[in-house]
């Protein structure tokens, strides 16, 4: 049995980032072998969950993207943006899909934003180095990384302490462990975002009730808007239940 790494999240992420940077594809079995070594045990014996492995993979991809030249160029011309989108699609073709789910994922709708969609949302937000960016439900930082790559000051909030440990590896300007349904009420007064970029849970609420209503996503957005500076921009990725023609 291998000895557990003192920072398994970072260990998995570093191996994944190396693979992505080299343009090599890898399988879920390769990822789980890396996780076995990082955690000093296996999923079967309960040392870590499948979500720990997946989140380590996402962290590695996000770390790579944050410093990649093609990502930094993605905020330029339309041609640059299309090239960035193409490079992201190539990366997605080389990584395993997340076919296994956990109770935590289902209860709190922890479905990470694909890099192609995250880039599109960030591009729409028109982020510059003068901005202060807030991601209220940051997960592993798939949305937040774009602000950092483009020189902005970025803050991320994540309710799950387990996922927050991964997010903290990304080197944002600050992270918080709060319920995004109350983000304006609980964040320090000096956090004044000019941009909010978000992918709120489409229906699930945090806490003991764990109710599933579209109104919960609306509450996330209202709280984020209350915190947004006057003249700021908010870009939200939403489910069909929030569309104008939804019943």
PLM region descriptions:
Residues 206-212:
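Surface-exposed cleft-lining segments at the edges of enzyme active sites
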Residues 172-181:
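Conserved SAM-binding strand-loop segment of SAM-dependent methyltransferases
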Residues 121, 212-247:
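Conserved Class I SAM-dependent methyltransferase catalytic core
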Residues 5-168:
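Class I S-adenosyl-L-methionine
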Residues 186-196:
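A short acidic, Gly/Pro-enriched loop at the edge of an enzyme's catalytic core
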Residues 204-206, 243-244:
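Short glycine-rich, flexible loops that bind phosphorylated cofactors or substrates
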Residues 197-201, 237:
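Amphipathic alpha-helical repeat scaffolds
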Residues 129-130, 151, 191-193, 231:
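A general structural motif
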